[in-house]
Amino acid sequence: MPFYRRSAGSPAGHPLSRLLVLSGPSGVGKDTILREVRERHPGLYVSVSATTRPPRPGEVDGRDYRFLSAAEFEEWIATDDLLEWACYVGNYYGTPKTPVLERLAVGEPVVLEIDVQGALQVKNNFPAAMLVFIRPPSLEVLAERLRSRGTDAPEAIERRLARAREELALADRFDHQVVNDKLAAAVEAVERLLFEEIPDEPAGG
């Protein structure tokens, strides 16, 4: 069952009401939650973001990210081929526009997993999109998760935590917030938001 969410000024059943944006601080568990949801719903379309950062071990181009050169990414910016984009720690990140709009045009739900500023860009451009903020139980728990990944130097972790504080201050601008304390509960919460159907309002309502 597809999800439908109504935003101010967006009619029920509007194609863009099928656009869900999942966001939250780095290390909060967005990837894990989304992977679990996709295992339960293999046909769910999740947009593949583009980036200029180098691939991490095990990442595959076209599956985890579209890995581009800076020149290629800047060409996409110039030709308006991105729904949103940002530069973080010297690397570009963004969402290719065409695949998302093609899916929405034929009535398929689409999920974006992007950073907080990108999510707010999408909401500004597409008010019918539903924003879901994944938050940690505490900053202390988030710090431990970042350290346990073993992919960042201590200085980089501190930068990520500083950014997390800024992003948490924006959480109230999202339509929904989910605390990733127990993974199973967080997955179920996101799944309910994805596949909950909201009926049309009565005429004149």
Curated annotation (Swiss-Prot):
Residues 17-195 form the Guanylate kinase-like domain. InterPro entries: GK/Ca_channel_bsu (IPR008145), Guanylate_kin-like_dom (IPR008144), Guanylate_kinase (IPR017665), Guanylate_kinase_CS (IPR020590), P-loop_NTPase (IPR027417). Keywords: ATP-binding, Cytoplasm, Kinase, Nucleotide-binding, Transferase. It catalyses: GMP + ATP = GDP + ADP. Its EC number is 2.7.4.8. It holds the Pfam family Guanylate_kin. It comes from the Bacteria. ATP binds at residues 24-31. GO terms for cellular component: cytosol. Essential for recycling GMP and indirectly, cGMP. Belongs to the guanylate kinase family. This is Guanylate kinase. The lineage of its organism: Bacteria, Bacillati, Cyanobacteriota, Cyanophyceae, Gloeobacterales.
